[in-house]
């Protein structure tokens, strides 16, 4: 069938066909890093019910690869439905996401070698650091994840998409109703593209800010860097005190991700 319209809005996500067909460029890098995710069911109440959270970061040698360098458990339905994730080395090609390997990985993250899990789905998620410098061409306008592609760090995605939608919607309404000329629509890219670029930079910086945390949890000179680094955090001497002070500073840096109010309000 055919639909005729005066304007078209492409808000079709990070794999936008509208962006592709329109030929709008992206600046930055797509798929600069990768994470394996598994959606699974298991009763973890004995490990989590007394310390409830939505996210659990797990420091272990089995999940020490990548910028974050930690495994993650995300509670979907406490305390039986979960998403587990760990960094991937993209240079090694497609990862092994067989049931046996995924079960082994989840058990290592949880720390329970006999944990029974039911795997629902597995997937690979890629970290993007890219934005469109221009959001429109002619009578076609793009917005949302189509024009700013970034990780969820700092929780900036939904707010930014809503900001795009609000900015474009009232302008389209004014033009269509005859309250303003079409020149008003030129301001959409001018106002929103800088916000998209800023959000992409901030979200990716929030991932990079895990670097100082990783250093606190690791001793590069040891056979097991993570085990040795964690042990040194409890050292009663000067070295342990210095490592704990560095950890406090590294945790404070994460305020920009979890508690800051700023760029997400643009």
PLM region spans:
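Conserved short loop/turn motifs at secondary-structure junctions
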Residues: 88-92, 156, 206
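Short helix/loop capping segments that flank catalytic or ligand/cofactor-binding pockets
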Residues: 18-19, 48, 150-151, 197, ...
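Conserved FAD-binding catalytic core of PHBH/FMO-like flavoproteins
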Residues: 7-127
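Core beta-strand elements of the Rossmann-like FAD/NAD(P) dinucleotide-binding domain
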Residues: 1-7
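Hydrophobic alpha-helical scaffolding
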Residues: 92-96, 158, 178, 237
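Conserved mid-domain beta->alpha element of the FAD-binding
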Residues: 10, 119, 125-205
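Structured loop/turn residues at beta-strand edges in well-structured enzyme cores
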Residues: 3, 114, 138
